[in-house]
UniProtKB/Swiss-Prot annotation:
The gene is rplM. Belongs to the universal ribosomal protein uL13 family. This is Large ribosomal subunit protein uL13. Part of the 50S ribosomal subunit. It comes from Oceanobacillus iheyensis (strain DSM 14371 / CIP 107618 / JCM 11309 / KCTC 3954 / HTE831). One of its GO terms (molecular function) is structural constituent of ribosome. This protein is one of the early assembly proteins of the 50S ribosomal subunit, although it is not seen to bind rRNA by itself. It is important during the early stages of 50S assembly. CDD domains: Ribosomal_L13. Gene3D superfamilies: Ribosomal protein L13. GO terms for biological process: negative regulation of translation; translation. One of its GO terms (cellular component) is cytosolic large ribosomal subunit. PANTHER family: LARGE RIBOSOMAL SUBUNIT PROTEIN UL13M, RIBOSOMAL PROTEIN L13.
Length: 145
């Protein structure tokens, strides 16, 4: 007789959580959000199943970086054409694309593969304090740090 609980799609209850990024450090916020997306904050966590909650991050443009990372940290992408390497520093990313900056940080902390991509789809990042998920009745989540 098996007594260990194994979560599957039929018995998972997902909540919607709102996290305010204002004044938070990028890495600390990203690691906690990645843990929520994986479902590690629940007693029903199962490594091979997607048990995590949906997370809405607001005020992404007010995220903080310590030290001189705002000028030194670089984000790279490539067009797959010769000489197609593009780079931006963290200051440009925070002013122009703060949503991408947070998505890159969080998704880099999720598992690689199909399950990790499925978990990443439950992340919703917004630049300001407004989001369009009021119908899901999200709860405010206070970060531990």
């Amino acid at each position: 007789m098996r007594t260990t609980f194994m979560a599957n799609e039929a018995n998972i209850e997902r909540k919607w959580l709102v996290v305010d990024a204002e004044g938070q450090r990028l890495g600390r916020l990203a690691s906690e959000v990645a843990s929520i997306l994986r479902g590690k904050h629940k007693a029903t966590y199962t490594p091979h199943a997607d048990t995590g909650d949906n997370v809405i991050i607001i005020n992404a443009d007010k995220i903080e970086l310590t030290g001189n990372k705002i000028n030194d940290k670089m984000y790279y992408r490539h067009s797959n054409h010769p000489g197609g390497l593009k780079e931006r520093n963290a200051y440009e990313m925070r002013t122009k694309y703060p949503e991408q900056m947070l998505e890159i940080a969080v998704k880099g902390m999720l598992p690689k593969g199909p399950l990790g991509r499925k978990m990443g789809k439950k992340l919703h990042v917004y630049r300001g304090a407004e989001h369009n998920h009021q119908a899901q009745k999200p709860e405010v989540y206070e970060l531990r740090g």
